Amino acid sequence: MNNFILFIVTLFCWSPTWYVIKFQLGYVDPLVSVFYRFLIAAIIIFVYLIYKKKNLMFSLNQHLWFLLFGTCLYSLNYVFFYLSNTYLISAFPAVVFSTVVIMNILGEHFYFKKKPSLKTLIGATIGMIGIIIIFSDEIFNFSLANGTHVGLFLALLGTFSASTGNMVYQRNLNNNFPLIPTLAYAMLYGSLVTLLITQIKGTELLFEYSLSYIASLAYLSIVGSIFAFIFYLRLLEKVGAGRAGYVGVVMPVLALLISTVFENLEWQQDLIIGLPILIIGAVLVINQKIKPIK
């Protein structure tokens, strides 16, 4: 599968998840839904690996890296984003997540000594200006009585966790960790970390038997977790974390279109101006490092 197809498939697997997550909120605590999502995904992958008689034996050191990867990408990342969705319309956490491309570039510099160029810094600055414009009302009308600032902060924490997970996967890739078994163990460990968090909080393990909850959980577990991450991490293997992060740049556009259709989102002037600026900044960051996807 070539890079462009990997990019498109990943994009269309992930973009609807920002809206679908809304059906997970309500009766069941968001953290419990995260636990269910990745436990189900892990079980499905393990069944596949056992059926295919793939090797599932790894060293303690490898398991520790699986644990770190899973904690960052399949626990904390989603815990923060599920919680942010209780404060923000679904498209806005997706917009914040687009900054993952900037965090990935900086992470590559910090962890792998890849020094960012001047163009990288300019692109990152432009991207941040776009974010500020989009959320200008929330920024300039900051109030502790308004939950928006909490949602933004949680979305940024989720993005940072995702970027850190990308860096851990890049490290694991450099050490020849196999993709599918890595996903299986990382999702299992991530789900268990989330379960631990729920128990520390004293959260009750409830389940909602409505069609909307079960259908959204199935989509998020199978399409939004298994397939999306297989395609995304395969793309990361082929083109690097910086360019793979371009998925996070385009995703807000589709997420906003979905919110426009299903949540009656009105495109205000700050959104119309800020979103293209955000995309321009992120594209500048990517294009200066690696040639565009072909």
What are these language model-derived features?
Residues 1-32, 144-171, 192:
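Glycine-/small-residue-enriched transmembrane alpha-helix faces in small-molecule transporters
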Residues 27-76, 103-104, 160-168, 183-202, ...:
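Transmembrane alpha-helices of multi-pass small-molecule transport proteins
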Residues 44-53, 100-125, 253-273:
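C-terminal transmembrane-helix exit sites in multi-pass transporters
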Residues 13, 17-18, 46-97, 133, ...:
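Specific transmembrane alpha-helical segments of multi-pass solute transporters/efflux pumps
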Residues 37-39, 137, 213-215, 249-294:
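C-terminal-most transmembrane helix of multi-pass membrane proteins
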Residues 34-36, 92-99, 168-191, 221-261:
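Helix-helix packing/entry segments at the starts of transmembrane helices
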